[in-house]
Amino acid sequence: MANRETVVKRLVSAVNQIHRWVDIVFPELRQVFKILTCKGALETLRLFPLPADLSKLEPNDVIAGWKKSMKRHSGVRRAKLLIELAKQTVGSSQATQAYKLHLEHLLEEYDLANTQLRRIEAEAKTVLERIPYAAKILAIIGISAIALAGVLGESGDLSGLYPRKHTAASRRP
C-alpha cells in the first residue's frame, strides 16, 4: 500500500500541474469545464492544447475531434463557447511550443499514474478475495476494499485476535 500512496501523490501532483498550466495558458477553459480532470476537458487539452489552435476551428471541427474519443461529446454550445473564449484568452501566448510539450508530458504523467493506480487497486481487491475474513469486514458499511487492504497491509493477519467476549472474560479478577 506504500506504493499506492506514492502513485496517488504523483497523480495529485500531475493534476495540480495541469491546473497550473491551464491557469497560465488558457484560464478561460474553466468557464467551459468546471472540473479539469473530466473526460471532456482532458480530451480537449489533448486534441487542442493551445487557444490559438482552437480559435482557428469551427464548432463542427471541435465536435468531430471529441467524437473520435468520446461516446457522448460536450455539445455544440460548449464547442462555440470554447472557440469564443480561445479567441479572447488572456493566457500566455509566448513559448507556445514549450507549453504544448509541457502539457503533453503532464497528460502522459496523469495517464500513467491513473493506470498504475487502477492496477494497484485491482491487485489489492484480488488479494482481499483470498483472505477468508475479509468479506465479513467488507460487509461493514463505510469500509472500502482499499481501506481494508491498507489496514491489513499495515497490521498484518487479524485472524489471531480473540473475540471481544473472550478478552473481557480474561480480564476479570
PLM segments and residue spans:
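A detector of single, family-specific signature residues
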Residues: 1-173
